[in-house]
């Protein structure tokens, strides 16, 4: 991997910016002579199930060498800001043009087309962050609702997944397909468990679901509550009964797609574009480099997950 990386970097002009999403990339990239080192912390990876034991040591090394730190949400910023003098908070952004396609009536994919309404959906990785017991209880309480689960199942045994006639696992889908599935839902769900692995998350699903014109029902994830909890179209639930109650209110909103709840959400989304985020990040990196990279970027190495 190191030889491949060196060969790749050798073809680019300087300056070189190394951009890390995870400290696990350090062992084969720490030798690079970078003009700027960016640590883009999107999750508290050490809290995830099966996290490598040496992850925390590598993260400290990355924090020591980084010139600037970006954090994906307020909770993560609070966890990192005292560990680096140049840390900045970037709440979830959204590609409104892409996800707003879901506001139109789109031809439905075969694995969703025949599912009865109301449809309540989730997309994303189904792992230890997902509250499978919550899903099981909701499906039992409302057998007339269809629960559509889009995404790969990871770190959860097949036999532990809740199974019911109204729970539908349709597997992982591409980014391009997500608005199509979203368009066929009545309510979008974020039934996250409240545990170590969700303590610092700031789900990008929240603005994506809203951009798709769907009311959202979520567990009480800290960054969701404080960033979106005041919106009429975002409902916060604390248990299965609360989830069902919130979903009933959200279903009423879904029947009024031009209601005040969506106009209110759109106002928030208007300031949440990835272009705005990119421009702000580029400005902070420019300060490190001492040159403007907003128009012509330097050689960028993305040391990704």
State each model region's role:
Residues 255-286:
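A charged, aromatic-enriched C-terminal amphipathic alpha-helix characteristic of glycosyltransferases
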Residues 156-182:
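Nucleotide-activated donor-binding/catalytic signature segment of Leloir-type glycosyltransferases, i.e.
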Residues 4-7, 52-69:
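Membrane-proximal helix-turn-helix segments that form the acceptor-binding/catalytic region
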Residues 233-241, 249-255:
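Conserved acidic donor-binding segment of nucleotide-sugar-dependent glycosyltransferases
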Residues 130, 176-181, 188-210, 217-229:
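Nucleotide-sugar-dependent
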Residues 75, 90-102:
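Carbohydrate-associated surface elements
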Residues 111-130, 135-139, 147, 270:
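Conserved donor-binding/catalytic core segment of Leloir-type glycosyltransferases
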Residues 274-305:
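C-terminal alpha-helical cap of glycosyltransferases
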């Amino acid at each position: 991997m190191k030889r491949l990386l060196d060969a790749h970097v050798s073809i680019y002009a300087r300056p070189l910016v190394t951009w890390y999403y995870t400290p696990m990339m350090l062992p084969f990239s720490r030798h690079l002579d970078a003009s700027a080192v960016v640590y883009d912390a999107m999750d508290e990876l050490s809290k995830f199930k099966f996290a490598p034991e040496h992850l925390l040591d590598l993260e400290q090394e990355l924090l020591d060498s980084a010139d600037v730190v970006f954090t994906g949400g307020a909770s993560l910023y609070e966890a990192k800001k005292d560990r680096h003098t140049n840390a900045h908070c970037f709440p979830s952004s959204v590609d409104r043009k892409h996800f707003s396609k879901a506001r139109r009536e789109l031809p439905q994919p075969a694995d969703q087309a025949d599912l009865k309404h109301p449809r309540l959906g989730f997309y994303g990785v189904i792992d230890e962050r997902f509250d499978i017991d919550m899903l099981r209880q909701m499906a039992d309480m409302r057998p007339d609702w269809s629960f559509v689960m889009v995404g790969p199942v990871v770190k959860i045994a097949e036999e532990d997944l809740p199974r019911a006639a109204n729970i539908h696992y349709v597997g992982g889908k591409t980014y391009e397909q997500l608005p199509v599935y979203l368009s066929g839902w009545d309510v979008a769900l974020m039934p996250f468990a409240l545990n170590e692995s969700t303590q610092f998350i700031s789900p990008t699903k929240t603005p994506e679901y809203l951009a798709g014109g769907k009311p959202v029902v979520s567990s009480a994830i800290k960054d969701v509550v404080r960033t979106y909890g005041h919106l009429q179209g975002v409902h916060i639930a604390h248990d299965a009964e609360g989830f069902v109650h919130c979903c009933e209110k959200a279903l009423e909103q879904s029947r009024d797609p031009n209601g005040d709840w969506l106009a209110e959400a759109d106002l928030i989304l208007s300031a949440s574009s990835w272009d705005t985020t990119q421009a702000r990040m580029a400005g902070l990196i420019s300060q490190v480099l001492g040159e403007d990279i907003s128009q012509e970027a330097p050689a960028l190495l993305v040391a990704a997950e």
